């Protein structure tokens, strides 16, 4: 048994499973203990069922001891953003409109996780309908600070050592922003790599699924598991996919070169953020070329907002029409 196993990355836990130093039950119990100790302050979880998770962990351990085939995430607990349909768990989308909502439908990405042997520990908090209205989730490093949104709970849960992996979604920075705020790895792969089937739709043009973890290898592994073609997602990619984990662990074949754009909103950054960026650019030295973006780049923020607002009004028209009094003023 490994003490404080909740601190392990998914890759470390898988190695410990293989060597017999750790069981899935021990890991899940450790994660649940960490949640009980800290989530009153962080509020990362919208739904948690420890008993079901432990039953799944026991089955994972039984399969492993029997020498049967195991998947890439066998016995690893994972959190899901609460806009992803998961049979036998509520999907409430951060709004009282869907309080207690359950469906028999299972998102394709949930099927992929279960096929890989992952344990769905519960649902992580999202902003209202995965849009802009903030929730109660706090930043694990400082409860006075925001964890970022809209995948607030997923990023906070990984940063607080509640789970080694979590799934989020991004329409306007909703994976990479909370990952940055909470200090975790966040990865939003190419559009169409991970199926959106069974995920709340707010913008057919912009919605995407992403991953959170505490190491580069972990987010690569999770992306490999989730990635697949899905005929029910109109943008799903049918082309061959590179193995992300292999790529993440390989040496770069050439010295990478980078372009740095001084964006129109850099003047809004804090002094600490600007100093940090400049320090990285100085370390990279000749590998970086500083470039000035076109003036029209500033218009992209307005364009993105118009697309998002128009499409969420389309996709959720029935919800808005029938429940207008339960919609926040910010979303209205």
What are these regions (language model features)?
Residues 13-19, 79, 97-102, 207-214:
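Short, well-ordered beta-strand elements within core beta-sheets of diverse protein domains
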Residues 24-29, 58, 271-294, 317-322:
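Acyltransferase
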Residues 53-55, 63-134:
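Acidic/His- and Gly-rich active-site-bordering loop/insert found
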Residues 1-54:
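An N-terminal boundary/leader segment
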Residues 105-229:
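Short glycine/serine-rich loop segments
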Residues 73-93, 249-257, 303-332:
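Short helix-loop capping/hinge segments that flank enzyme active sites or metal/cofactor-binding pockets
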Residues 43, 234-241, 256, 262-264, ...:
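Flexible, acidic loop-helix segments that line cofactor/substrate-binding pockets
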């Amino acid at each position: 048994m490994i003490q404080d196993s909740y601190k392990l990355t998914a890759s470390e836990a898988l190695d410990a499973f293989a060597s017999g130093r750790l069981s899935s039950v021990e890991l899940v119990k450790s994660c649940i203990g960490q949640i009980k100790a800290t989530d009153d302050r962080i509020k990362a979880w919208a739904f948690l069922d420890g008993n079901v998770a432990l039953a799944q962990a026991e089955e994972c351990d039984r399969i492993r001891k029997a020498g049967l085939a195991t998947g890439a995430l066998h016995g690893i607990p994972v959190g899901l953003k609460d806009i992803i349909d998961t049979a036998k768990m509520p999907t409430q989308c951060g709004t009282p409109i869907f309080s207690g909502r359950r469906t028999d439908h299972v998102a394709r990405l949930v099927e992929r996780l279960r096929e890989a042997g992952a344990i769905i520990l519960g649902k992580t908090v999202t902003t209202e309908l995965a849009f802009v209205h903030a929730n109660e989730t706090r930043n694990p490093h400082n409860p006075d600070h925001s964890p970022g949104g809209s995948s607030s709970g997923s990023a906070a849960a990984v940063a607080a050592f509640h789970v080694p992996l979590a799934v989020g979604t991004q329409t306007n920075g909703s994976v990479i922003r909370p990952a940055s705020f909470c200090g975790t790895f966040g990865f939003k792969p190419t559009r169409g790599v991970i199926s959106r089937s069974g995920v709340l739709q707010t913008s057919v043009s912009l919605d995407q699924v992403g991953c959170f973890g505490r190491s580069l290898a972990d987010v690569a592994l999770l992306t490999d598991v989730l990635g697949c073609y899905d005929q029910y997602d109109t943008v799903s990619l049918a082309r061959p996919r590179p193995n992300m984990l292999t790529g993440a662990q390989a040496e770069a074949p050439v010295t990478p070169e980078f372009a740095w754009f001084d964006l129109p909103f850099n003047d809004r950054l804090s002094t600490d953020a600007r100093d940090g960026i400049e320090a990285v650019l100085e370390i990279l030295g000749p590998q970086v070329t500083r470039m000035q973006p076109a003036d029209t780049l500033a218009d992209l923020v307005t364009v993105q907002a118009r697309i998002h607002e128009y499409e969420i009004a389309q996709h959720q028209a029935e919800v808005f029409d029938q429940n207008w009094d339960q919609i926040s003023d910010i979303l209205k």
